[in-house]
Amino acid sequence: MKKLLTAVATALLIATPSLADPAVKGWKTNDSLGCMMLRECVDETWEISTVADMEDRLRYSNYDTVREETNAIIAELDKMGVKVYLASDKYFPRGHAGVYSTVSNQFFLNDSYADDPIQMLRTLRHEAWHAAQDQWACGNENTQIAIIHNEEEVPQGYVLAAEIAYGNSPVLPWEKEAKWAGGTPNMTLNMLRLINDNNGRPWDVKEPTPMTREWLEMKGCM
């Protein structure tokens, strides 16, 4: 339970440039990703409060099919103190559609993927699930994330998708359920509502996994 999400840790442990003059070593690298996540690079990043904010920035003009769920997820994230940003593709290493930071409680959507409303919503659900995992680790003031579901609950199709994407990476257990959430309408939204409706203590109404329970007890949250 003391492992950080590897993608986040990689981005945050690298040397980052100063606020005054961010000298990014290269775009579409972990260096540029970390600079953005630490908010030392803010050019071409835009805070998103509703779908309308994305429509102002992106070419695709019809987000009607995803508007309701997207707006609801962003509203629940706001209640948790999590900010959502749309950001230029230049910050993201190849294949990164989005990233969540357990340090700043912010996440960033790659504008080159967000231009497709279905892909955008899947990424939003996925990264917002990581925000929920952060809260399950005894509150999002920490830099840890917890597994919410027992691994055997994750449908096999999403297990395989995560294994293809992440291989034998230590983050695989977290990513399996995030993949599941990303592909399942309202799964992330319902979890965020459970968190907010219970004052940030979802474990009071939903039994945690054995390992997460052990962590919560160690931290004095149960």
Task: Name each model feature, range by range.
Residues 1-4:
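Positively charged n-region of N-terminal signal peptides that target proteins for export
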Residues 16-20:
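Sec/Tat signal peptide C-region and signal peptidase I cleavage site
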Residues 21-22, 31, 36-103:
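Auxiliary, metal-adjacent structural segments of Zn-dependent hydrolase domains
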Residues 128-145:
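Catalytic Zn2+-binding segment of zinc metalloproteases
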Residues 142-222:
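Metalloprotease/metallohydrolase-associated module, dominated by Zn2+-dependent proteases
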